[in-house]
């Protein structure tokens, strides 16, 4: 599902809200989540999951085109850990 598909679905389900209001709400929420992660904050949404940063240490990689070894710096990457309710809901759908 893309961001625009999410906005479409929410706008249809919440017909009392204007499409532009739903669009602004989704974009604002995603911007705040992104900003919180960028500043190193952990985000926890009970029942859904948590977002945090994990550090990937520096390593030696290889350029697949030339075969040359390349030194890659360490970096932080976003990490999502699903909550118990989300895991159970996903598993229930796939166990049928």
Swiss-Prot record:
One of the record's GO molecular function terms: DNA binding
Leader peptide range in chain numbering: none
GO CC entries: chromosome; cytosol
Residue spans crossing the bilayer: none
Short name of any one Pfam family annotated for the protein: Bac_DNA_binding
Region entry Disordered, spans: 59-78
NCBIfam families with a match to the protein in the record: hip, PRK00199.1
Record function comment: This protein is one of the two subunits of integration host factor, a specific DNA-binding protein that functions in genetic recombination as well as in transcriptional and translational control.
Protein family per UniProt: Belongs to the bacterial histone-like protein family.
Protein name: Integration host factor subunit beta
Species for this entry: Thioalkalivibrio sulfidiphilus (strain HL-EbGR7)
Gene: ihfB
